[in-house]
Amino acid sequence: MIKPEESRFAAGTIFFLLFPTPDRRPGLTFRYGEHLSMRIAFAGTPDFAAAALKALIAAGHTITLVLTQPDRPSGRGMKLKPSPVKAVALEHGLIVLTPLALRGPKAGDEGEAALKALEESESYVFVVAAYGLILPERALNAARGVGEDGSIKSINIHASLLPRWRGAAPINRAIEAMDKETGVDLMKMDIGLDTGDVICSAPVAITEDHDAAQLTEELTQVGARLIVTALEHPETLTHRPQLENGVTYAKKLLKTESPIVWTQDARQVAARIRAFSPFPGSTTVRNGETVKIWFAKAVEGSGQPGEILAVGDAVVIACGTGAVACTRLQRAGKPAMDAKPFAQSLQLKIGEVLV
């Protein structure tokens, strides 16, 4: 039996210490010395989810159905572009459905057809990763179920250690809050917002070298490994309720959060810059021109908030307390640059004040 609290190890690694017996249920094929292959339905949209889908395919599982969000306009030409999950699904010849919604007035016939397809897919488990659409209870209960008690019908791959950072932007909010650790949880889904029982966890340390893009990539790989490892022996999985203490919510990122508040403590300013890289970005204004800062670390220094204290390998800017060393910056309409060529292009001078 796998106990979730025994499955946490450092560096995003999870170990399952068990000796399984063959599962002879219809739809499952046990192969001694290899993985247990079964029928899996999948829902997800971004790269975080696409990596998990690739890993499940590589592990030999049969993907019965893929749900992902509709194609979106992208690039300067605003041409419709499929989601990363759809691209993977099409590459492997999988059935892909892209309903606008699965419940509510927007669901319509397309949403109903997707739910019916999910129910008729004869899947043993429904794996969800950053899908982006609200799933009705009907979808959560569509699969047959795995686990010791057979009750795990849908599994969510969530990029935090629950109950901390339930919601839409757990990676960004963890960096913004200066957390020292985050990770990936596999969660038995229920109708609440990331409130389901935890199946297993893989913690990952957060350092000052992580921005949101880098941490997302790391957690993406951890999540892909975690779901494959868990489903090697699905009949042994257990689950436990989330702790009642320590619940926090990772609210959706907004473009209105971009402006840097230089009166804040330098550690907070630097954390927000890294948390909002690449989206929504962190901006300041110099002589009426908007400047985006992509990466920064807190350093010692004092001056008027927003004042440039040094220019070189980093542009050092004073905050309410301390200063931040900015090493990657960008002018509007221009590519991002390292600090030194950026400062030269704008002829930045010590003593200037950014707002």
Language-model-derived ranges and their functions:
Residues I14-P20:
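Hydrophobic alpha-helical signal peptides and transmembrane signal-/tail-anchor segments
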Residues P4-S7, P20:
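Hydrophobic residues within membrane-embedded alpha helices
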Residues E257, T263-V355:
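An anion-binding loop in the catalytic cleft
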Residues R8, G12-T13, G27-P278, R331-G333, ...:
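One-carbon transfer enzymes
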Residues P4, V66-L67, A296, L329:
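Generic beta-strand hydrophobic packing signal
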